[in-house]
């Protein structure tokens, strides 16, 4: 009976074993496992340290557990007015009045962040050691939020030459995208990643990139436009059905231990 099944599912989600779902499923979906091996450039990001690495991972784990165990809407993965921080992460995020190593649920003080897309874990794992990567960030949103399949990069396409191109990272990437061989992938992915350019490579908020004002405008694959991470979250919420399907497919793939087949 559905009512009995519902009771049993809620009981299971309250059990300590749900930690395994967090470690394994969230570890894959949010790429939390990868963070342990990342090495951000400490010359560029002088505030980076091991306590911050641990806090970044723990925030996303606690957030995922809260949504699951408290039977919250899955749409809070896209946008929420709260998160979980300790003193180290609150300093990184600019959230005042948080003291001590213990994590606690806090209300976010502004609309800069909300949901997993703007958590430092996702922002860090989709960046390069010394700078952000709009294409990596865009690809993550494209595949893990919208549930779409990103086209493979064209063969023999040269990497972005940092020393030859000028301006903000966005401007340099637009010059790079002028190469027709690069345009196919980048035209789909870059506009999503640009919406997160207000966050540096370790997930800290910024208004400028090397002295230049940041242009965080972008567009979804269907043409929906946004300007900045707050608007980006709103247009993603408008695609709620895509996200629900994406998350359901990923959970089913995780449960089965294999990819899904359609007949």
Regions found by a protein language model. Name each.
Residues 258-263:
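Short, intrinsically disordered, charge-balanced linker/junction segments flanking boundaries
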């Amino acid at each position: 009976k559905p009512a009995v099944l519902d009771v049993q599912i809620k009981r299971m989600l309250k059990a300590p074993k749900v930690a395994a779902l967090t470690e394994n499923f969230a570890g894959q979906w949010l790429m939390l496992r990868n963070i342990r091996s990342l090495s951000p450039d400490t010359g560029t990001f002088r505030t980076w340290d091991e306590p911050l690495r641990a806090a970044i991972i723990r925030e996303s784990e606690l957030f995922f557990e809260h949504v699951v165990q408290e039977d919250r809407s899955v749409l809070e993965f896209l946008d929420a007015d709260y998160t979980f921080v300790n003193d180290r992460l609150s300093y990184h995020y600019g959230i005042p009045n948080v003291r001590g190593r213990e994590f606690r649920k806090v209300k976010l003080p502004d609309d800069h962040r909300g949901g997993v897309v703007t958590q430092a874990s996702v922002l860090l794992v989709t960046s390069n050691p010394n700078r952000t990567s709009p294409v990596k960030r865009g690809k993550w949103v494209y595949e893990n939020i919208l549930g779409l399949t990103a086209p493979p990069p064209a063969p023999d396409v040269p990497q972005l030459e940092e020393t030859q191109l000028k301006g903000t990272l966005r401007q340099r990437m637009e010059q790079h995208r002028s190469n027709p061989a690069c345009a196919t992938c980048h035209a789909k992915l870059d506009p999503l990643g640009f919406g997160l350019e207000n966050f540096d490579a370790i997930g800290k908020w910024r208004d400028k990139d090397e002295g230049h004002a940041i242009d965080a405008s972008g567009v979804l694959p269907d043409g929906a436009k946004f300007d900045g991470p707050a608007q980006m979250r709103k247009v993603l919420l408008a695609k709620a059905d895509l996200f629900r399907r994406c998350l359901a497919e990923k959970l089913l793939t995780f449960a089965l231990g294999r990819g899904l087949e359609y007949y």
